[in-house]
Amino acid sequence: MKTILTACLSLLFCIHVKAQSNFYKISVGGGFGVTQSFTDLKKHSFGLAGYGLADYYFTPFISAGIEGQMGKIKGDDTKIPPNERYFTNSYKAFTLNGRIALGALIDYEKNGFSNTIKGLYLGTGLGLVLNKVDRIKEDREVPLYPGKESSKNLLFPVNVGINFYFSDHSDYTRYILNFNYQSNLTIGEGLDGYDDSSKKFRSGNPDIYTYFSVGLRYQFGSVGLFKKTVF
Protein backbone atom coordinates (compact mmCIF):
# COMPACT_ATOMS: atom_id res chain seq x y z
CA MET A 1 0.00 0.00 0.00
CA LYS A 2 2.83 2.34 0.90
CA THR A 3 4.51 1.61 -2.43
CA ILE A 4 1.32 2.38 -4.37
CA LEU A 5 0.81 5.65 -2.47
CA THR A 6 4.40 6.69 -3.11
CA ALA A 7 4.03 5.92 -6.82
CA CYS A 8 0.80 7.96 -7.04
CA LEU A 9 2.38 10.94 -5.30
CA SER A 10 5.40 10.74 -7.59
CA LEU A 11 3.13 10.66 -10.64
CA LEU A 12 1.18 13.69 -9.44
CA PHE A 13 4.43 15.54 -8.79
CA CYS A 14 5.70 14.77 -12.29
CA ILE A 15 2.44 15.93 -13.87
CA HIS A 16 2.56 19.15 -11.84
CA VAL A 17 6.15 19.83 -12.83
CA LYS A 18 5.40 19.10 -16.47
CA ALA A 19 2.56 21.63 -16.44
CA GLN A 20 4.99 24.42 -15.59
CA SER A 21 7.77 26.10 -17.54
CA ASN A 22 10.62 28.51 -17.02
CA PHE A 23 11.12 31.71 -18.99
CA TYR A 24 13.68 34.51 -19.24
CA LYS A 25 12.44 37.86 -17.96
CA ILE A 26 14.55 40.21 -20.09
CA SER A 27 14.23 40.68 -23.85
CA VAL A 28 16.06 42.93 -26.30
CA GLY A 29 15.59 43.16 -30.03
CA GLY A 30 14.99 45.20 -33.11
CA GLY A 31 13.64 45.20 -36.61
CA PHE A 32 12.55 47.26 -39.57
CA GLY A 33 9.38 48.13 -41.40
CA VAL A 34 7.22 50.56 -43.32
CA THR A 35 5.53 53.75 -42.11
CA GLN A 36 2.44 55.38 -43.61
CA SER A 37 1.22 58.90 -42.89
CA PHE A 38 -2.35 60.02 -42.17
CA THR A 39 -2.02 63.78 -41.79
CA ASP A 40 -3.41 66.96 -43.36
CA LEU A 41 -2.14 65.83 -46.76
CA LYS A 42 -4.45 63.67 -48.84
CA LYS A 43 -1.85 61.23 -50.16
CA HIS A 44 -0.76 58.73 -47.50
CA SER A 45 2.78 57.97 -48.60
CA PHE A 46 5.14 55.27 -47.31
CA GLY A 47 8.54 55.51 -45.64
CA LEU A 48 11.09 53.18 -44.07
CA ALA A 49 12.00 52.96 -40.38
CA GLY A 50 13.87 50.79 -37.90
CA TYR A 51 13.38 50.18 -34.20
CA GLY A 52 15.02 48.79 -31.09
CA LEU A 53 13.42 47.77 -27.81
CA ALA A 54 13.94 46.26 -24.38
CA ASP A 55 11.15 44.48 -22.47
CA TYR A 56 10.62 42.99 -19.04
CA TYR A 57 8.40 39.88 -18.99
CA PHE A 58 6.18 39.33 -15.95
CA THR A 59 5.02 36.09 -17.61
CA PRO A 60 5.80 34.75 -21.11
CA PHE A 61 2.69 36.64 -22.30
CA ILE A 62 2.64 39.90 -20.28
CA SER A 63 5.39 42.47 -20.73
CA ALA A 64 6.32 46.14 -20.38
CA GLY A 65 9.22 47.99 -21.93
CA ILE A 66 10.74 50.83 -23.90
CA GLU A 67 11.02 51.28 -27.66
CA GLY A 68 12.91 53.65 -29.93
CA GLN A 69 12.17 54.27 -33.61
CA MET A 70 14.03 56.17 -36.30
CA GLY A 71 13.11 56.65 -39.93
CA LYS A 72 11.04 58.55 -42.46
CA ILE A 73 7.37 59.54 -42.54
CA LYS A 74 6.23 60.97 -45.87
CA GLY A 75 3.34 62.71 -47.59
CA ASP A 76 3.09 64.16 -51.10
CA ASP A 77 0.27 66.28 -52.53
CA THR A 78 2.42 68.02 -55.16
CA LYS A 79 0.21 66.61 -57.93
CA ILE A 80 -3.05 67.34 -56.10
CA PRO A 81 -4.20 70.97 -56.55
CA PRO A 82 -4.81 73.44 -55.04
CA ASN A 83 -2.50 72.75 -52.08
CA GLU A 84 0.40 70.96 -53.84
CA ARG A 85 2.34 70.30 -50.65
CA TYR A 86 4.80 67.63 -49.55
CA PHE A 87 6.78 66.64 -46.48
CA THR A 88 9.44 64.18 -45.35
CA ASN A 89 9.76 63.80 -41.59
CA SER A 90 13.10 62.33 -40.44
CA TYR A 91 11.61 61.40 -37.10
CA LYS A 92 12.69 59.77 -33.86
CA ALA A 93 10.15 58.33 -31.43
CA PHE A 94 10.50 56.97 -27.90
CA THR A 95 7.69 55.13 -26.11
CA LEU A 96 6.83 53.15 -23.00
CA ASN A 97 4.67 50.15 -23.90
CA GLY A 98 2.73 47.36 -22.24
CA ARG A 99 1.48 44.22 -23.99
CA ILE A 100 -0.73 41.26 -23.11
CA ALA A 101 -0.90 38.17 -25.33
CA LEU A 102 -3.70 35.68 -25.82
CA GLY A 103 -1.66 33.00 -24.06
CA ALA A 104 -2.30 34.78 -20.76
CA LEU A 105 -6.07 34.43 -21.20
CA ILE A 106 -6.76 31.09 -22.89
CA ASP A 107 -5.92 27.42 -22.38
CA TYR A 108 -3.80 26.99 -25.49
CA GLU A 109 -2.53 23.52 -24.58
CA LYS A 110 -5.71 21.70 -25.69
CA ASN A 111 -5.53 22.16 -29.46
CA GLY A 112 -3.11 23.13 -32.19
CA PHE A 113 -4.87 26.29 -33.37
CA SER A 114 -4.97 27.86 -29.90
CA ASN A 115 -1.31 27.01 -29.48
CA THR A 116 -0.46 28.69 -32.79
CA ILE A 117 -2.19 31.97 -31.89
CA LYS A 118 -1.13 32.12 -28.23
CA GLY A 119 1.35 34.85 -29.14
CA LEU A 120 -1.32 37.18 -30.56
CA TYR A 121 -1.23 40.36 -28.47
CA LEU A 122 -2.61 43.85 -27.91
CA GLY A 123 -0.74 46.73 -26.32
CA THR A 124 -0.62 50.47 -25.78
CA GLY A 125 1.58 53.09 -24.22
CA LEU A 126 2.80 56.69 -24.15
CA GLY A 127 5.71 58.45 -25.76
CA LEU A 128 7.27 61.38 -27.57
CA VAL A 129 8.00 61.93 -31.26
CA LEU A 130 10.77 64.32 -32.37
CA ASN A 131 9.91 65.80 -35.75
CA LYS A 132 12.47 67.10 -38.26
CA VAL A 133 10.51 67.98 -41.38
CA ASP A 134 11.59 68.85 -44.91
CA ARG A 135 8.67 70.81 -46.41
CA ILE A 136 7.79 73.63 -48.80
CA LYS A 137 10.11 76.63 -48.30
CA GLU A 138 8.31 79.98 -48.34
CA ASP A 139 9.71 83.53 -48.53
CA ARG A 140 6.38 85.21 -47.80
CA GLU A 141 6.06 87.46 -44.75
CA VAL A 142 2.76 85.70 -44.02
CA PRO A 143 3.30 82.06 -45.05
CA LEU A 144 0.62 80.31 -47.08
CA TYR A 145 1.37 77.09 -45.23
CA PRO A 146 2.14 77.88 -41.57
CA GLY A 147 3.94 75.31 -39.46
CA LYS A 148 7.29 74.26 -38.01
CA GLU A 149 10.13 72.19 -39.39
CA SER A 150 11.23 71.01 -35.93
CA SER A 151 8.88 70.12 -33.09
CA LYS A 152 7.99 67.60 -30.39
CA ASN A 153 4.61 65.91 -29.93
CA LEU A 154 3.09 63.52 -27.44
CA LEU A 155 2.52 60.09 -28.94
CA PHE A 156 -0.03 57.39 -28.09
CA PRO A 157 0.83 54.04 -29.74
CA VAL A 158 -1.53 51.07 -30.11
CA ASN A 159 0.12 47.75 -30.99
CA VAL A 160 -1.45 44.64 -32.51
CA GLY A 161 0.79 41.74 -33.46
CA ILE A 162 1.90 38.18 -32.96
CA ASN A 163 4.97 36.51 -31.46
CA PHE A 164 6.36 33.13 -32.49
CA TYR A 165 8.49 31.51 -29.79
CA PHE A 166 11.65 29.43 -30.24
CA SER A 167 13.36 27.56 -27.42
CA ASP A 168 16.97 26.91 -26.47
CA HIS A 169 18.42 23.54 -25.40
CA SER A 170 16.79 23.94 -21.95
CA ASP A 171 13.33 24.46 -23.49
CA TYR A 172 13.27 28.08 -22.29
CA THR A 173 12.01 30.71 -24.74
CA ARG A 174 15.21 32.19 -26.19
CA TYR A 175 14.16 33.79 -29.49
CA ILE A 176 10.96 35.53 -30.57
CA LEU A 177 9.99 36.29 -34.17
CA ASN A 178 7.64 39.28 -34.13
CA PHE A 179 5.17 40.83 -36.58
CA ASN A 180 3.68 44.10 -35.35
CA TYR A 181 1.23 46.72 -36.62
CA GLN A 182 1.39 49.99 -34.72
CA SER A 183 -0.94 52.98 -35.00
CA ASN A 184 0.43 56.21 -33.51
CA LEU A 185 -1.80 59.15 -32.63
CA THR A 186 0.07 62.41 -32.07
CA ILE A 187 -1.07 65.45 -30.11
CA GLY A 188 -0.18 68.53 -32.16
CA GLU A 189 0.50 69.56 -35.74
CA GLY A 190 4.18 68.69 -36.02
CA LEU A 191 4.17 65.34 -37.81
CA ASP A 192 3.80 66.82 -41.31
CA GLY A 193 5.17 70.29 -40.50
CA TYR A 194 1.94 72.03 -41.49
CA ASP A 195 -0.40 73.72 -39.01
CA ASP A 196 -3.73 74.05 -40.83
CA SER A 197 -5.65 75.29 -37.79
CA SER A 198 -6.45 78.63 -39.46
CA LYS A 199 -6.86 77.38 -43.03
CA LYS A 200 -9.97 76.36 -44.90
CA PHE A 201 -8.38 73.06 -46.00
CA ARG A 202 -7.91 71.96 -42.38
CA SER A 203 -8.63 68.25 -41.98
CA GLY A 204 -9.98 68.47 -38.43
CA ASN A 205 -8.26 65.18 -37.53
CA PRO A 206 -5.15 64.50 -35.43
CA ASP A 207 -1.94 63.55 -37.24
CA ILE A 208 -1.42 59.77 -37.26
CA TYR A 209 1.18 57.45 -38.66
CA THR A 210 1.20 53.67 -38.80
CA TYR A 211 4.18 51.34 -38.68
CA PHE A 212 4.22 47.72 -39.83
CA SER A 213 7.39 45.94 -38.75
CA VAL A 214 9.14 42.58 -38.60
CA GLY A 215 11.62 41.95 -35.81
CA LEU A 216 13.64 39.45 -33.80
CA ARG A 217 14.07 39.41 -30.02
CA TYR A 218 16.58 37.68 -27.77
CA GLN A 219 15.63 36.69 -24.22
CA PHE A 220 18.02 36.30 -21.29
CA GLY A 221 18.55 37.25 -17.65
CA SER A 222 16.77 36.04 -14.53
CA VAL A 223 14.37 33.12 -14.87
CA GLY A 224 10.69 33.06 -13.92
CA LEU A 225 8.25 30.19 -13.47
CA PHE A 226 5.00 30.02 -15.46
CA LYS A 227 2.03 27.79 -14.67
CA LYS A 228 1.80 26.37 -18.21
CA THR A 229 4.25 25.10 -20.78
CA VAL A 230 5.12 27.50 -23.60
CA PHE A 231 6.09 24.72 -26.06
Where are the regions that the model predicts?
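Gram-negative (and chloroplast) outer-membrane scaffold detector with strong preference
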Residues: 62-140
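Short glycine/proline- and aromatic-enriched beta-strand/turn motifs that initiate or cap beta-hairpins
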Residues: 19-57, 63, 219
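Transmembrane beta-strands of outer-membrane beta-barrel pores
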Residues: 32-38, 68-74, 102-104, 126-132, ...
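Predominantly the C-terminal beta-signal and adjacent terminal strand-loop region
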Residues: 78, 91, 165-231
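Residues on the lipid-exposed face of transmembrane beta-strands in outer-membrane beta-barrel proteins
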Residues: 30-34, 52-56, 96-100, 124-128, ...
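Short loop/turn motifs that connect adjacent beta-strands in outer-membrane beta-barrel proteins
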Residues: 20-25, 61, 104-118, 166-175, ...
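Residues that define the transmembrane beta-barrel architecture of outer-membrane proteins
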Residues: 24, 44-50, 90-94, 116-118, ...
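Extracellular loop and loop/strand-boundary signature of outer-membrane beta-barrel proteins
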Residues: 36-40, 77-88, 142-149, 198-204
